[in-house]
């Protein structure tokens, strides 16, 4: 075969271009059917008891074990697992073509990722809300528990470092030119998003206190949550906070400290609840935009089993597309925090399986947006995956008549929240893993250093 460069090979394999509308409809139908049939079949097969008392009630402590409504737990689960991965992974892996990425998102999401998330949640709820480490001790032994928890804690440190840098960089209002720090072109946009993020933290506490005092649920809870979201955006759009990346790093670390130690109902849960409304708006905007504009999928169908930059399709595709298909981190969220707040076992399917299905849909959307942004010859759009996704969805919002500035700020806030909601979840899981690593059976008579 004559030598051809990668771009030419991509064009040769591209064939007839697919309409983006068809791809997103395939994703919605496949993922929806998987949830309705396979997810419910698993629940029936494993055995869900709606009358059983969950750990949220039997071990209620007002901190980690807190009975919560179905949507509250779902919002926590979804916002915690939907980090940077579902956006960055599919876009980076699309160099192999959009078909292998789409297949892995659907097959992996339904039969691997959702099963793992649901299974971890189920196992924890059925074992008194114990985390994965404590369940390992029950079936394997204390050495297995300690090894797992040590790995888990070290893993959380790496994720905290990476995601904190990502969040701080998103809100950073400065850039360096010729060795001098000057205001960036996007300073106002980033500053507005930064203020909104801080307002989310403030209103989350207010929302949590209101929920606690008035025991809100259903539409009342949703209305108060939406009002807090609107108020956060209203304040943030008018008062941009112009700070450096270092300043935002300090703010981020202060926030995740409190998110890790404060009761779930006071900060983490209400913030996740508010953030989920924003994510749903982002996903709805992307879906409607793709349905209305139905752009062409400009990325090639399949480029081959090797890529000169990433390497071979196996295992790179499955490493790059983790969140959105299957990610071990999700099991830590399911067993570490969500299982302790489930108020009824019948909610586990929607929380464990359903949240993963929605994340897979988000990943399919990211792939379609990247395909629409690519050039006619299949060359990927310039910029980071977050930038490509943000520009694409913001463009859909502008198409609906939403002002450019608001659309840009909204998407900047969304992509930062994808990282931040996973960051605070990781911080809390890291704190719990560290505690469990040094825990003993009789903590009342344990040595002082262990209690500390």
Describe each region flagged by the PLM.
Residues 69-85, 245-262, 274-276, 285-295, ...:
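Hydrophobic, membrane-embedded alpha-helices of multi-pass small-molecule transporters
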Residues 142-157, 354-360, 407, 436-452:
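Loop-to-transmembrane helix boundary motifs in multi-pass membrane proteins
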């Amino acid at each position: 075969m004559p030598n051809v460069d990668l771009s030419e090979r991509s064009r040769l394999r591209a064939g007839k271009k697919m309409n983006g509308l068809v791809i997103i409809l395939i994703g919605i139908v496949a993922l929806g059917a998987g949830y309705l049939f396979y997810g419910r079949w698993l629940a029936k097969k494993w055995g869900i008891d709606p009358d059983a008392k969950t750990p949220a009630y039997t071990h209620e402590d007002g901190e980690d074990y807190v009975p919560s409504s179905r949507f509250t737990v779902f919002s926590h689960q979804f916002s915690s697992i939907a980090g940077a991965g579902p956006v960055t992974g599919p876009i980076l892996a699309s160099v192999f073509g959009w078909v292998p990425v789409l297949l892995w998102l659907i097959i992996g999401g339904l039969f691997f990722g959702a099963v793992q998330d649901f299974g971890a949640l189920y196992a924890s709820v059925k074992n008194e809300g114990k985390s994965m480490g404590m369940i390992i001790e029950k079936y394997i032994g204390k050495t297995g528990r300690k090894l797992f928890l040590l790995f888990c804690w070290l893993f959380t440190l790496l994720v905290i470092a990476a995601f904190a840098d990502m969040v701080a960089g998103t809100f950073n209002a400065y850039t360096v030119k010729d060795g001098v720090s000057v205001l960036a072109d996007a300073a106002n946009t980033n500053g507005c998003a930064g203020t909104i993020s801080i307002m989310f933290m403030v209103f989350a506490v207010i929302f949590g206190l209101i929920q606690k005092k008035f025991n809100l649920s259903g539409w009342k809870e949703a209305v108060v949550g939406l009002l807090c979201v609107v108020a956060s955006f209203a304040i943030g759009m008018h008062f941009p906070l112009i700070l450096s990346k270092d300043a935002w790093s300090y703010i981020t670390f202060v926030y995740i400290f409190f998110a890790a130690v404060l009761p779930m109902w006071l900060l983490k849960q209400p913030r996740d609840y508010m953030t989920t409304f924003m994510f749903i708006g982002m996903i709805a905007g992307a879906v409607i935009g793709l349905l209305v504009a139905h752009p062409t999928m400009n990325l090639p169908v399949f480029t081959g089993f090797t890529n000169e930059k990433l390497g071979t399709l196996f295992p790179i595709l499955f490493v790059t597309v983790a969140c959105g298909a299957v990610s071990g981190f999700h099991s830590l969220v399911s067993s570490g925090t969500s299982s302790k707040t489930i108020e009824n076992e019948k909610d586990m399917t929607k929380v464990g399986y359903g949240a993963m299905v929605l994340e897979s849909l988000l990943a399919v959307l990211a792939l379609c947006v990247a395909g629409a942004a690519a050039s006619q010859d299949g060359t990927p759009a310039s910029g980071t995956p977050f930038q490509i996704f943000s520009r694409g969805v913001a463009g859909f919002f502008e198409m609906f008549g939403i002002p450019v500035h608001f659309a840009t700020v909204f998407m900047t806030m969304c992509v930062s929240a994808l990282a931040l909601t996973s960051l605070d979840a990781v911080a809390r899981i890291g704190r719990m893993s560290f505690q469990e690593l040094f825990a003993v059976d009789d903590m009342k008579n344990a040595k002082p250093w262990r209690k500390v």
